[in-house]
Amino acid sequence: MPLIIGIDPGSRLTGYGIIEKDGSKLRFVDAGTIRTETQEMPERLKRIFAGVERIVKFHGPTEAAVEQVFMAQNPDSALKLGQARGAAIAALVNLDLQVAEYTARQIKQSVVGYGAADKEQVQMMVMRLLNLTIKPQADAADALAAAICHAHASGSMSKLTVLNALGGMARGRSRSSSRRR
């Protein structure tokens, strides 16, 4: 059964989420954040790299999904986000994982059925799809959503499974949910 790690990169908080995929079923394994908010940028990147590496070595995922950088209005923020993303990807690749990349819109479309969903909607759908009783922290939920998106994109999850998990929330959006990659 594939074990998928999702990464939501950030220069202060990098979210990670690990799920197990068994056919059309998903199981929560672990989620959290790598905190780097008090260090200078080189130390932050080191901490992201080491944190991702430690998590991968502990859990042994077989697949990885990382959220792509969006172009922020602030070029400095976009640069820092790109550096954090690079540190996370380098750690994954250093441990021989292939990395799938998805835009935030693709992830939201796959998980919520709506590419412009807000963070609260993503958190609620992650809870529903993984049968969680406690709402994950936003960065961890985004990382879990990236892993779920990858599970859907890898072809082992059927559209029907996702729509069943959505329940009443899928009404009116089922056609758009089929356009995920």
Swiss-Prot record:
Q: Which SUPFAM superfamilies match?
A: Ribonuclease H-like (SSF53098)
Query: Which biological processes are named by the entry's GO terms?
Result: DNA recombination; DNA repair
Q: Which Gene Ontology molecular-function terms are recorded?
A: crossover junction DNA endonuclease activity; DNA binding; magnesium ion binding
- Record-annotated residues binding Mg(2+) 1? D8, D139
Q: Which reaction does it catalyse?
A: Endonucleolytic cleavage at a junction such as a reciprocal single-stranded crossover between two homologous DNA duplexes (Holliday junction)
Q: Which UniProt keywords apply?
A: Cytoplasm, DNA damage, DNA recombination, DNA repair, DNA-binding, Endonuclease, Hydrolase, Magnesium, Metal-binding, Nuclease
Q: What cofactor is this protein dependent on?
A: Mg(2+)
List ligand-binding residues for Mg(2+) 2: E67
Which E.C. number(s) belong to this protein?
Answer: 3.1.21.10
Q: How is the cofactor bound?
A: Binds 2 Mg(2+) ion per subunit.
Superkingdom classification of source: Bacteria
Catalytic residues in the record = D8, E67, D139
Judged by the first EC level, this protein's enzyme class is hydrolase
What InterPro entries is this protein classified in?
RNaseH-like_sf, RNaseH_sf, X-over_junc_endoDNase_Mg_BS, X-over_junc_endoDNase_RuvC
Q: Which Gene3D superfamilies match?
A: Ribonuclease H-like superfamily/Ribonuclease H (3.30.420.10)
Q: Which residues cross the membrane?
A: none
Q: Provide GO CC annotations from the record.
A: cytoplasm; Holliday junction resolvase complex
Q: What is its main location?
A: cytoplasm
Q: Where in the cell is it found?
A: Cytoplasm
User: Self-association or partners: how does it assemble?
Assistant: Homodimer which binds Holliday junction (HJ) DNA. The HJ becomes 2-fold symmetrical on binding to RuvC with unstacked arms; it has a different conformation from HJ DNA in complex with RuvA. In the full resolvosome a probable DNA-RuvA(4)-RuvB(12)-RuvC(2) complex forms which resolves the HJ.
The similarity comment for this entry is: Belongs to the RuvC family.
Listed PANTHER family:
CROSSOVER JUNCTION ENDODEOXYRIBONUCLEASE RUVC (PTHR30194:SF3)
Q: Quote the function comment for this protein.
A: The RuvA-RuvB-RuvC complex processes Holliday junction (HJ) DNA during genetic recombination and DNA repair. Endonuclease that resolves HJ intermediates. Cleaves cruciform DNA by making single-stranded nicks across the HJ at symmetrical positions within the homologous arms, yielding a 5'-phosphate and a 3'-hydroxyl group; requires a central core of homology in the junction. The consensus cleavage sequence is 5'-(A/T)TT(C/G)-3'. Cleavage occurs on the 3'-side of the TT dinucleotide at the point of strand exchange.
Designated name of the protein = Crossover junction endodeoxyribonuclease RuvC
Q: What gene name is given for the protein in this entry? A: ruvC
